[in-house]
Structure formats: C-alpha cells, structure tokens
C-alpha cells in the first residue's frame, strides 16, 4: 500500500503543474478560442486535455516511484529478508510480477487517482485564470473528498483508493479488486471530462 499520506496532497498539487499550466497558457494567450474555432468542437479540446492529463500525471507518478527506488536501491535492499504478507496489499501480484512491476502497478492506481484530482485544476483555470488556483483546487478537492468519503462504504473511500488498498468487501481477489480500482478511476476521470465539456460548451456557445 502507498502509505505516504503526508505527501499525497503535495504530490497532487505538484502533478497539477503538468497540464493545468498549458490550459492556463491557452486561455491567457487566446489560443483556446483559436483551437475551438479551428476544430469546430470543444469536446475535442477537452478530450485531448483530459487524456493528456491522465497520461502525464500517471507516467510521472510511476516514473517518480521507480526513480526513487533506483535512488535508494544502493542504500537498502529492494526486498527485505522476511517480507510480511499481512501488511502488503496485492501480495500475490507482488509474488507474480516481482517488486518493480508491482510498484508500477500500484503507482498506476495512485497516478489515475491523482489525474482525477488534478483535472479539477483544468476546470478552475477557465473560471479563474490563475496558476495558483489550479494547484490549490486539486489540493483542496483531495482533502475534501478524503474527509467526506471517510463516512462512506469501503468501496468509495478515497483514502483506500489513493493508497492502492483492496476495496471490495465481497472478495479478497487481487484481480477483481485491482480491476475495480482502475475501472472506478477511469470512470471518475471520464465523468470529470464530461462535466468540463458541458460547462465549457454552455459557457462559450452562449458567449
């Protein structure tokens, strides 16, 4: 599990730099309006930005985790002499794929989680063209949903989701739990894109 709770919000705020900044530049330079007129459909622009945000944030997350592992590898063993199965989520995936691919698989979950939260930064720059606002809103939404979902069933708990924990109470199967987490995050990112598209379509078509 990814127990770096004190740093998750900071990581999300930093990762929001990857795509929200380019949207801010589009708006401040007038490029967004040019793009809208050129492609004829605002959804193409939104899809490209949501897809780019997901790809950049996820790959940066996985790359960052693996880079950190490479950095500390000379200082400590990659795997302890006596790994404890009971504190390692998806232990069978770890046994099957090995430590590096296991970390990449867990990083994928946090990366998709982070891309969902950073997508709120894409929203805010259209209404408040400010770089700081884009980073702050991702940070605040993460903490807000973390607090709200603490009272919801395990399957909807943001803490479990961003920690790459197994979320399904009905089964301990790593396959179904991993599939559920990734599918839920893909759906959340898609919903974020759809809402952004509808908001912008209404705003710019109505002048």
Give the location of each predicted region.
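Short helix-to-coil transition segments within interhelical loops
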Residues: 36-42
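Central hydrophobic cores of alpha-helical transmembrane segments
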Residues: 131-145
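Secretory targeting signals
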Residues: 1-22, 47-122, 126, 164-183
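Junction motif at the cytosolic side of a transmembrane helix
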Residues: 127, 184-207
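Residue-level recognition of pore/gate-forming positions within transmembrane alpha-helices
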Residues: 53, 139-143, 189
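Helix-loop interface residues and adjacent transmembrane-helix termini in multi-pass membrane transporters
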Residues: 39, 127-128
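Juxtamembrane non-transmembrane "cap" segments at the membrane-aqueous interface
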Residues: 74-87, 141-160
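Transmembrane helix boundary and interhelical loop/hinge segments in multi-pass membrane proteins
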Residues: 19-36
């Amino acid at each position: 599990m990814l127990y770096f709770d004190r740093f998750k919000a900071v990581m999300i705020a930093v990762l929001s730099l990857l795509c929200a900044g380019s949207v801010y530049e589009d708006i401040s330079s007038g490029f967004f309006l040019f793009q809208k007129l050129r492609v004829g459909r605002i959804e193409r622009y939104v899809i490209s930005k949501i897809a780019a945000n997901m790809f950049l944030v996820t790959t940066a997350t996985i790359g960052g985790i693996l880079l950190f592992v490479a950095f500390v590898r000379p200082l400590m063993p990659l795997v302890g002499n006596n790994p404890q199965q009971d504190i390692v989520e998806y232990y069978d995936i770890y046994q099957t794929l090995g430590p590096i691919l296991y970390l990449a698989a867990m990083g994928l979950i946090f990366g998709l989680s982070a891309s969902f939260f950073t997508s709120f930064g894409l929203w805010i720059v259209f209404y408040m063209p400010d770089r700081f606002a884009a980073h702050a809103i991702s940070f605040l939404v993460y903490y807000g949903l973390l607090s709200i979902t603490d009272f919801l069933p395990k399957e909807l708990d943001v803490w479990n989701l961003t920690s790459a924990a197994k979320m399904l109470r009905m089964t301990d199967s790593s396959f179904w739990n991993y599939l559920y987490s990734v599918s839920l995050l893909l759906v959340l990112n898609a919903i974020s894109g759809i809402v952004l598209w509808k908001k912008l379509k209404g705003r710019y078509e109505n002048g």
